[in-house]
């Protein structure tokens, strides 16, 4: 089940959303010529490593990586999957709360996502990279504010592929339930994997809650 389109506001240009997508793509392209060893060093330097922050809370660089890690991705599939979700769902939230507040909202839910993942895995020395946590916050906000919007999805039935339109509440609820189950199983020793599911959960919950705060500011579109 892959979302490919939704109902968008007419006559609105979500340039902050475009800027976020363009920045993520540019960083990925910039790093493409690097060797595997150089990439490992770069990700270790600019990825978010929970152990680095929890072992030394006064380490300023560790706090900076909360932001830099949001623009790094582990591969082309990781990048394109994240950007697809941001492209589809981000513009509605930017329209709802305005350009500047959307940028603040995006980074705020990204921080919340990182905090929950670090709380669950405080001793992890594996760099966390990706915009998934922040985008999960966008999804949480979308679920609350646009539950009845129709989302076009690619639906796979064995070898048959169909495009169907279903309410956002169904698409995003299924997505969140999957994150919950995956997060639970990642707590089982030996099942940790390489996905920060609790960042997804934390970001989604933060977005669901914080959008109610952001809508109180002037400029909110009802």
What are the roles of these predicted feature ranges?
Residues 1-222:
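A detector for small-residue-rich transmembrane helices and their helix-helix packing motifs
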């Amino acid at each position: 089940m892959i979302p490919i389109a939704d109902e968008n506001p007419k006559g609105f240009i979500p340039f902050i959303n475009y800027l976020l997508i363009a920045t993520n793509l540019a960083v990925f392209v910039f790093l493409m010529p690097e060797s595997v060893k150089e990439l490992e060093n770069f990700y270790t330097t600019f990825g978010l490593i929970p152990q680095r922050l929890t072992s030394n809370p006064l380490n300023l660089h560790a706090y900076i990586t909360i932001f830099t890690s949001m623009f790094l991705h582990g591969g082309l599939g990781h990048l394109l999957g994240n950007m697809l979700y941001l492209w589809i769902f981000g513009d509605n939230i930017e329209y709802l709360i305005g350009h500047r507040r959307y940028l603040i909202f995006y980074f705020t839910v990204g921080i919340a996502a990182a905090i929950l993942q670090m709380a669950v895995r405080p001793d992890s020395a594996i760099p966390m990279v990706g915009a998934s946590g922040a985008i999960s916050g966008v999804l949480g906000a979308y679920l609350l504010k646009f539950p009845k919007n129709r989302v076009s999805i690619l639906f796979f039935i064995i070898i048959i592929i169909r495009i169907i339109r279903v309410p956002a509440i169904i698409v995003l609820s299924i997505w969140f339930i999957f994150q919950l189950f995956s997060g639970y199983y990642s707590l089982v020793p030996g099942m940790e994997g390489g996905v920060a599911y609790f960042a997804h959960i934390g970001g989604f919950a933060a977005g669901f809650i914080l959008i109610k705060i952001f809508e109180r500011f002037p400029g909110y579109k009802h």
